[in-house]
Amino acid sequence: MGVDLTGISKKSRVIRHHTYSTNPYIKLLIKLYKFLAKRTSSGFNKVVYQRLIKSRSNRAPISLSRIAVVMKRKAVFTAKSKAAPIAVVVGDVLDDVRMARIPAMRVCALRFSKSARQSIVAAGGECLTFDQLAMIAPTGKNTYLLRGRKSGRESVRHFGASGVPGSHSKPYATNRGKETKRGRRTGRSYKRKAFRHV
């Protein structure tokens, strides 16, 4: 008799070799960066190609404040400097209204929100697309690859068992009023019997 091999299917890693996106712009970028990854020896193009293939939930957005904090550590910015390093985000860049002043930054992303684009341009920065980046830095020189937190989604808060001690996962049913009110709990003056139709 053979032995049942349980859990074998869980061990296999799912690796994407193509995109499921119907966006023609992303499909063209995948072609471009696949070509650059083959023709150049830089690992930058390979990483960008792999991230372009990923699903939207794995291409998490990032806020301007996070980019500003990271880029401030990396380099000192001068207004409208073309030699400043480029922050590369394979995803969306969103505005942060809590940040009154942002430094002049050069940012390349798949998409910018309207207010994020206005903030970058107003600060003397530059918003780049990936085809422009391929012309400026075909090997990824003078660039910093950044990405947003994947755990920032609201649905991630529900992952795990919410009733287990020490677990901070959010329950799906937050309003438990009728189940735990007076007359239902033991030791609260009386216990109401369940109503039955005869």
From Swiss-Prot:
Subcellular location per the Swiss-Prot or TrEMBL entry: Cytoplasm
Pfam families membership: Ribosomal_L18
Biased composition (Basic residues): 179-198
CC terms in the record's Gene Ontology section: cytoplasm; cytosolic large ribosomal subunit; nucleolus
Record Gene3D superfamilies: 3.100.10.10
Chain residue ranges for the region called Disordered: 157-198
GO molecular function annotations of the record: RNA binding; structural constituent of ribosome
Keywords from the UniProt entry: Cytoplasm, Ribonucleoprotein, Ribosomal protein
DNA damage among keywords: no
PANTHER family noted in UniProt: 60S RIBOSOMAL PROTEIN L18, LARGE RIBOSOMAL SUBUNIT PROTEIN EL18
Protein name: Large ribosomal subunit protein eL18
Organism: Leishmania major
Name of the encoding gene: RPL18-A
